[in-house]
């Protein structure tokens, strides 16, 4: 059996992403299912998104409309 390549999502600048979408922290958190507190920690650099959250942020970064449509 061969080795599988492990997907490593890229780091996302959450504050910049939110700014490009022209959303407040509260709006971004509500639309994409994050808590405002978690979003604030990411933006301050206290914590870094990981796992499924990081994957979701990468998808939002590439195609926010598709994520919003899927979440409706």
Regions found by a protein language model. Name each.
Residues 10-13, 52:
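N-terminal positioning helix adjacent to the helix-turn-helix/winged-helix DNA-binding module
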Residues 14-27:
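Short basic helix-loop element that most often maps to the first helix and adjoining turn
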Residues 14, 33, 38:
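Short glycine/proline-centered loop/turn elements that form peptide/ligand docking sites
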Residues 19, 33, 44:
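Residue-level detection of the helix-turn-helix DNA-binding "recognition helix"
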């Amino acid at each position: 059996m061969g080795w599988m390549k492990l997907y490593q999502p890229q780091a996302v600048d959450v504050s910049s992403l939110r700014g490009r979408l022209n959303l407040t922290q509260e709006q971004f958190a509500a639309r994409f299912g994050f808590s405002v507190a978690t979003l604030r920690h990411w933006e301050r650099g206290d914590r870094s998104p990981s796992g499924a959250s990081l994957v979701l942020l990468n998808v939002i970064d590439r195609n926010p409309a598709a994520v919003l449509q899927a979440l409706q």
